[in-house]
Amino acid sequence: MSDRLVVDSLGVAFGRTEVLRGLSFSVPDGARMAVIGPNGSGKTALFKALIGALPSTGTIRWAPGTRIGYVPQRLDLERDLPLSGHDFLHAKATLVQASEADVTRALRLVTLGRDVAQRPIGSLSGGQFQRLLLAFALLGHPSVLLFDEPTTGIDEPGEELLYATVERLQREEHLTLIFISHELSLVYRMAGLVLCLGRRGVHCFGPPRQILTPETLERTYGAPMDHYLHHAHGP
């Protein structure tokens, strides 16, 4: 299988503070990769470097023709604006030259009905708004989806629907999925690869069930993780 992404010796700094240094990994086309690590380990900085929103050193090589959809953890958008979900999507559609058919397709892919899309964005639940952001990312017909902590602020039923939607999309659209998560249960469920970032660099990279040992997690997070590892595997 060919690689969709190859990263070699990536570095990111904010002023004199290094956030990432010497980061190297590759992601096969169609793979699902999770990025885990404590706050401040550079997970979001990595995503922003991958989409060109942060300057970086080293090399980021996407396969030719790669189109990226990015779903942020949160969006700086006033939720009390008199703006419907449909209007929100149309604003993006104008930027990427997407058609009304593309908007309809994106809503269908995330199972968000037109009745919901016509409502003001401030009235949407956390799960509905997250699926709206996912539809927003899908308007450009991406081959890669970057998802920053997909379940932040969502209740359990909303989480399950979002998981199912993303898994189905990844299969049907043959997307390469790269997501950030603090939930090891989600990592085990959805990821074929995991990249562990700690405050002192990369602590592991590979299939989660092979590399997420208590020792690796303790090095990554700086504290024992036996409880979380057990919870991730289930009772």
Q: What do the predicted segments below correspond to?
A:
Residues E160-E172:
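Helical segment within the ABC ATPase nucleotide-binding domain
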Residues P120-L124:
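Conserved ABC ATPase signature
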Residues V194-P207:
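H-loop (His-switch) and adjacent beta-strand-loop-beta switch element
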Residues E100-V116:
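Conserved ABC ATPase "signature" region
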Residues P208, T213, R219-P235:
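ABC ATPase nucleotide-binding domains
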Residues S181-H182:
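H-loop/switch region of ABC-family ATPase nucleotide-binding domains
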Residues L145-D148:
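Catalytic Walker B motif of ABC-type/P-loop ATPase nucleotide-binding domains
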